[in-house]
């Protein structure tokens, strides 16, 4: 049976024809195209989840200072604030933001993370998965299933557009990570394949045009904050979709729109650290690049 797909439409068709969720279509695709046994494919994804889990929790036990210096300890501050019962966000969002920011601290200190789809956006998917797991007592196996769903969305983005900030801006990095997380969350919470991709499309609509402007050229700031924003965006999109709100624009078309917008961004706003936040006087002074002229 051919389980390969090159577009979201083809993916939905496979799901409908075989009465399978996105996660299972993606799993079978990996098995068939990679000529790899199911157990081996599952083992690799379980290992990815193990690394995600560790990177999302390690900085909460011992805050980590980044190599560049701009970030370190933010995740622990969020957790402490939450424990004081003074947070204004609900449990899922508070936890998701905390874990997402924690992963960026590990990445910025040269620790082990899973690029999902990139290092600079690596906190969004694990942040979402771990928050849902804790709040809804979800098993590791179901999380692994959801990660195959996220992988399907990431694969489509890499095949038909880009996940590189240098090509498409932050909308292509945190934006796609957020789309992956939203789709996975919808399946995890009982949504159907159409709802999953509706959520992914909503995410990209909400983040369309977001630039990539790392201060000092480091994948630290504003990247960490944007991972928190990305997982919040994913939760919003997932909730809208699960409530039955349909997305007007299909994921394939939204992906095309994101790619087109990204290619029109000037070079200064595509990971060169020459524009946006990176070009502000405060940012230049903070990274030692301010000449005073």
What are these regions (language model features)?
Residues 88, 115-122, 134, 138, ...:
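Glycine- and small hydrophobic-enriched segments that form the cores of compact globular domains
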Residues 1-111, 134-135, 244, 251-293:
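Generic N-terminal targeting/processing segments that precede catalytic cores or assembly contacts
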Residues 110-128, 172-177:
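Conserved phosphate/anionic-ligand binding catalytic regions in large, soluble enzymes, centered on
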Residues 126-137, 182-190:
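Alpha-helical support elements that line or immediately flank enzyme active sites
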Residues 187-293:
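Functionally critical mobile loop/hinge segments
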Residues 147, 153-166, 170-180, 191:
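Glycine- and acidic-residue-rich phosphate-binding/metal-coordinating active-site segment common to enzymes
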Residues 90-107, 141-161, 206-214, 273:
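Acidic-glycine-rich active-site phosphate/pyrophosphate-binding loop
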Residues 110-113, 163-169, 221:
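Active-site-adjacent structural elements in folded domains
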